[in-house]
């Protein structure tokens, strides 16, 4: 029903991995870091030219170098056949790292949503509007200075840098973003 009406949903991590793999070419699928490692190691055979896999990597610490490197290897292996959304981040410099890795959508925000458990459990919070402004300003400064901008554009299929998604979080992985 959702797909027929062009409503995007994210299949949560609570759905078994094999089912999520089957749904990847139809809608966005949430993966943990270990799931992405498994996906990166898969030989998917011949991917149809028009087939695209939509993956949202859901991780508490979007600044992890391991995450960025892993996403970069997935993008290098599957190219335009994978659309990656990941995060959350709370640092404009990490946005640039994501762009260089070829990530398509960057989830920005930490502890700012009404249901996000990061602030309550980890004592970490960053005001959403301030953070989005900082990331956007940093993005524009980078493009204006052309510092790394061409490398970032080459990293993924878009002519611009990755899209910014204001993500207020959720209290369990069954929530739709």
Where are the regions a protein language model picked out?
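Alpha/beta enzyme core
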Residues: 3-167, 171-177
């Amino acid at each position: 029903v959702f797909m027929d009406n062009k409503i995007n949903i994210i299949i949560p991590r609570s759905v078994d991995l094999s089912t999520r793999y089957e749904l990847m070419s139809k809608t966005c699928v949430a993966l943990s870091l270990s799931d992405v490692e498994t996906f990166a190691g898969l030989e998917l055979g011949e991917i149809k030219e028009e087939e695209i896999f939509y993956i949202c990597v859901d991780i508490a610490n979007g600044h992890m170098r391991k995450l960025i490197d892993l996403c970069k290897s997935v993008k290098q292996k599957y190219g335009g056949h994978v659309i990656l959304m990941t995060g959350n981040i709370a640092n404009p410099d990490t946005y640039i790292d994501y762009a260089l890795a070829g990530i398509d959508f960057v989830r920005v925000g930490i502890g700012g949503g009404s249901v996000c458990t990061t602030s309550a459990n980890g004592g970490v919070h960053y005001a959403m509007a301030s953070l989005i402004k900082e990331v956007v300003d940093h993005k524009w400064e980078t493009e204006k200075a052309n510092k790394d901008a061409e490398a970032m554009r080459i990293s993924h299929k878009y002519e611009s840098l990755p899209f910014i998604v204001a993500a207020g979080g959720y209290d369990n992985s069954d929530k739709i973003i």
